């Protein structure tokens, strides 16, 4: 280990930055956030330094480097564009046993600045020891996506409860189990983020009054239409925290690779026209695993509340008193249309969009008269097997036979394929496509020739 990671208490302590440009400004911002009493020494200053000085946040010393400014300092940063000046700052600091950072010159520095993930009071620092700042930045960005923005609020609130926890729970084991429940409670975290004091207090009292045995819960997560990059940050956080993930065929392998490695996985294989596991049995799997005290993620393609039967699954949990929450996802209509160059609405062609299931309960019938109306876009989910009927009904109820149509197979994935034509060809086009696929009907489909971007990459 070439560098010892430490966190410095700089509040109300003298620090010096030599340099008045953009790099110095970024370093100054960090030191000011840490509460340092800051002096900045440079020949010239960018405007932000003058703003800070006028607000009394720091002291500016205009002119060449003055090493006597180091005499009262705890820490220094050399951030000029002159290597000779930077080395002088480093040498002067070294002779006074003051830690000094030299920007872009780690070998000349006695300390280096890490990439920081700030969820104060929780802080995470990432460093490559100065060998690869870009790698450190990329790792920081990845960690940023994994750590919720409200984590700092949760940590601060935990600090307020420490005395009460210590008083109520006699052993370290009991306290540990309480904190484990506390920090994974999504309802508490969301209430803190929303500054909902009433909900925070209610959830806190429930945590203190419940048995310490972990209470199970279910999180319904929308995985999006295929591309793993379209999974939401909150969705990623949830699958990283799951004890067990119950998923179906529409969830891509790339997304499943993001699931916590030691989480159990249950494949239920749902797709239109074929249910590897009946819906009622899926409901019971969720209920059973949650009753064991597990954190269950039900991972569904697209958005769980748009033709995903998510509402039915949650009704079962609600009836049994199992806590649940929902993380929405990008629905297939939005993702597939965007990746196909087909805007769902357009000022000239469509003032509304309808999401329609082509997979009806026995005896069900759609409102074909309204579906055949002008100036709208229709998106049919699970409609491949009914494509010929959709074609026949729309024409029978007045839709023009030359209405553009598109079928998007494996939308947003590297296997995406789009076939398009006009309404009179819909039944025939459906024979060329395999599930999962989406049917889009409307004048906006004609824009695909101009707006298609994904297949060109």
UniProtKB/Swiss-Prot annotation:
Its EC number is 2.1.1.107, 1.3.1.76, 4.99.1.4. Pathway: Cofactor biosynthesis; adenosylcobalamin biosynthesis; precorrin-2 from uroporphyrinogen III: step 1/1; Cofactor biosynthesis; adenosylcobalamin biosynthesis; sirohydrochlorin from precorrin-2: step 1/1; Porphyrin-containing compound metabolism; siroheme biosynthesis; precorrin-2 from uroporphyrinogen III: step 1/1; Porphyrin-containing compound metabolism; siroheme biosynthesis; siroheme from sirohydrochlorin: step 1/1. Signal peptide: none annotated. Residues 216-457 are annotated as: Uroporphyrinogen-III C-methyltransferase. Pfam families: CysG_dimeriser, NAD_binding_7, Sirohm_synth_M, TP_methylase. The modification Phosphoserine is found at residue 128. Keywords: Cobalamin biosynthesis, Lyase, Methyltransferase, Multifunctional enzyme, NAD, Oxidoreductase, Phosphoprotein, Porphyrin biosynthesis, S-adenosyl-L-methionine, Transferase. S-adenosyl-L-methionine binds at residues 225, 301-303, 306, 331-332, 382, 411. NAD(+) binds at residues 22-23, 43-44. Residues 1-204 are annotated as: Precorrin-2 dehydrogenase /sirohydrochlorin ferrochelatase. In the N-terminal section; belongs to the precorrin-2 dehydrogenase / sirohydrochlorin ferrochelatase family. This is Siroheme synthase. It comes from Salmonella paratyphi A (strain AKU_12601).
């Amino acid at each position: 280990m070439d560098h010892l990671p430490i966190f410095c208490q700089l509040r109300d302590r003298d620090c010096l930055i030599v340099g008045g440009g953009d790099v110095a400004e970024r370093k100054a911002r960090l030191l000011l956030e840490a509460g340092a009493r800051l002096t900045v020494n440079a020949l010239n200053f960018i405007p932000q330094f003058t703003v800070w000085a006028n607000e009394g946040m720091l002291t500016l010393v205009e002119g060449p480097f003055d090493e006597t400014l180091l005499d009262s300092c705890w820490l220094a940063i050399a951030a000029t564009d002159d290597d000779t000046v930077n080395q002088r700052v480093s040498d002067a600091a070294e002779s006074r046993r003051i830690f000094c950072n030299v920007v872009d010159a780690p070998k000349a520095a006695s300390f280096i600045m890490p990439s920081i993930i700030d969820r104060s009071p929780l802080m995470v620092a990432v460093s490559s020891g100065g060998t690869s700042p870009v790698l450190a930045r990329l790792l920081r960005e990845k960690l940023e996506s994994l750590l919720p923005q409200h984590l700092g609020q949760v940590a601060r609130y935990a600090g307020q409860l420490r005395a009460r926890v210590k008083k109520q729970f006699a052993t370290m084991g009991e306290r540990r189990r309480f904190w484990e429940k506390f920090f994974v409670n999504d309802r508490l975290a969301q209430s803190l983020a929303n500054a909902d004091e009433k909900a925070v207090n209610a959830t806190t009292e429930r945590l203190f009054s419940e048995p310490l045995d972990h209470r199970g819960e279910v999180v319904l997560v929308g995985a999006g239409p295929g591309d793993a990059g379209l999974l939401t940050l909150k969705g990623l956080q949830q699958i990283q925290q799951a004890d067990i993930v119950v998923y179906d065929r529409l969830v891509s392998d790339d997304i499943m690779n993001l699931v916590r490695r030691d989480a159990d996985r249950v494949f239920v294989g749902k797709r239109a026209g074929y249910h590897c596991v009946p819906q009622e049995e899926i409901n019971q799997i969720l209920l059973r695993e949650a009753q064991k005290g597990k954190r269950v993620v039900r991972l569904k393609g697209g958005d769980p509340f748009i033709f995903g039967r998510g509402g039915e699954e949650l009704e079962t949990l609600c009836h049994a008193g199992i806590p649940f929450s929902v993380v929405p996802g990008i629905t297939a209509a939005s993702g597939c249309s965007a990746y196909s160059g087909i805007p769902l609405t357009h000022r000239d062609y469509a003032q509304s969009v309808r999401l329609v299931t082509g997979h009806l309960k026995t005896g069900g019938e759609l409102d074909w008269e309204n579906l055949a109306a002008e100036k709208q876009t229709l998106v049919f989910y699970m409609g491949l097997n009914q494509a010929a009927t959709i074609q026949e009904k729309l024409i029978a109820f007045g839709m023009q036979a030359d209405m553009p149509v598109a079928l998007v197979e494996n939308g947003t994935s590297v296997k995406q394929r789009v076939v398009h034509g006009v309404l009179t060809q819909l039944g025939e086009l459906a024979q060329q496509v395999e599930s999962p696929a989406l049917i889009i009907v409307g004048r906006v489909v004609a824009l695909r020739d101009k707006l298609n971007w994904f297949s060109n990459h």
